[in-house]
């Protein structure tokens, strides 16, 4: 009986921690995202202090692309030829990003999404934690980049 109570409590705790993603939240995906850390299935974490590339999402009507971009010191971005077509899929209380290239298809579940944080989980139960990013401007004496 005690074990059943512990399992029930842990299940409720897990369910209550998950954010409900609404269709109106999807617009928050648009923009530049920098990976902060990766959390593996057994809880190990890998932190990223600095990234050479950001993910740029451009989604409209639940379809769009994710492109790898490289921030430059003058506040601009170089775009690589690497991109994935992205579709947003709502399945019950879960929301997925379905990716497709010429060579592969895969999905990631959106665990949480806010104006400045994004967490997704892949089928291998690896979580990717992102923070919203912007231009890096180390030139022009700190003038704000447009």
Feature roles, as predicted:
Residues 2-8:
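Sec-dependent signal peptide recognition
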Residues 46-92:
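N-terminal glycine/threonine-rich, aromatic-flanked beta-hairpin/loop signature
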Residues 92-131:
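Surface-exposed, polar helix/loop patches in the mature regions of secreted/periplasmic/lumenal proteins
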Residues 29, 56-65, 90-94, 111-117, ...:
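Short, solvent-exposed coil/turn segments at beta-strand boundaries
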Residues 19-34:
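N-terminal helix-cap/turn-to-beta initiation motif at the start of protein domains
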């Amino acid at each position: 009986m005690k074990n059943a109570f512990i399992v029930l409590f842990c299940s409720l705790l897990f369910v209550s921690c998950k954010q409900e993603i609404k269709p109106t939240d999807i617009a928050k995906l648009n923009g530049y995202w920098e990976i902060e850390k990766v959390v593996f299935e057994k809880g190990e974490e890998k932190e990223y202090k600095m990234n050479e590339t950001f993910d740029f999402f451009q989604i409209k009507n639940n379809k769009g692309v994710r492109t790898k971009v490289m921030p430059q010191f003058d506040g601009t971005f170089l775009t690589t030829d690497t991109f994935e077509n992205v579709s947003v899929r709502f399945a019950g209380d879960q929301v997925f990003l379905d990716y497709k290239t010429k060579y592969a298809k895969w999905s990631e579940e959106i665990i949480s999404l806010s104006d400045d944080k994004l967490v997704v989980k892949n089928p291998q139960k690896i979580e990717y934690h992102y923070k919203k990013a912007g231009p890096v401007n180390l030139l022009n004496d700190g003038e704000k980049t447009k």
